[in-house]
């Protein structure tokens, strides 16, 4: 791959906790961030980045960082698969048995 060159570089920092930042390169890397002062003294930021993958598709991620932590969103972030219906039914059955007083030993064998 050839050397990438910066084709966009915008930065603004007001010195009071408000800022924005954006850049792009010739090989498709891009990033942007906007920041504002948070209610608890932290910097609240929103932004994202993207780049081209070897297969030609584009990776994209957006994020927010604030008093609630860092939260990222991207179709590339793995997600839990939903539980199959039979597992949900079995979990409900176990809860019902517990309500009726059922107990199990440490190996999962029902003792009452």
Curated annotation (Swiss-Prot):
Carbohydrate-modified residues: 79
Highest taxon listed in the record's lineage: Eukaryota
InterPro entries in UniProt: CHIT_BIND_RR_consensus, Insect_cuticle
Keyword Calcium: no
Domain Chitin-binding type R&R, chain residue ranges per copy: 16-85
GO molecular function: structural constituent of cuticle
Keyword Glycoprotein carried by entry: yes
Keywords (A to Z) from UniProt: Cuticle, Glycoprotein
Tissue: Arthrodial membrane.
Annotated protein name in UniProt: Cuticle protein AM1239
Species for this entry: Cancer pagurus
Lineage: Eukaryota, Metazoa, Ecdysozoa, Arthropoda, Crustacea
């Amino acid at each position: 791959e050839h050397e990438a060159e910066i084709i966009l570089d915008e930065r603004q920092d007001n010195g009071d906790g408000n800022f924005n930042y954006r850049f792009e390169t010739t090989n498709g890397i891009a990033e942007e961030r906007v920041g504002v002062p948070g209610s608890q003294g932290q910097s609240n930021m929103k932004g994202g980045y993207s780049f081209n993958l070897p297969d030609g598709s584009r990776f994209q991620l957006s994020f927010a960082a604030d008093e609630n932590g860092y939260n990222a969103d991207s179709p590339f972030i793995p997600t839990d698969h939903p539980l199959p219906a039979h597992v949900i039914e079995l979990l409900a059955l176990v809860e019902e048995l517990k309500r009726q007083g059922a107990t199990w030993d440490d190996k999962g064998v029902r003792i009452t």
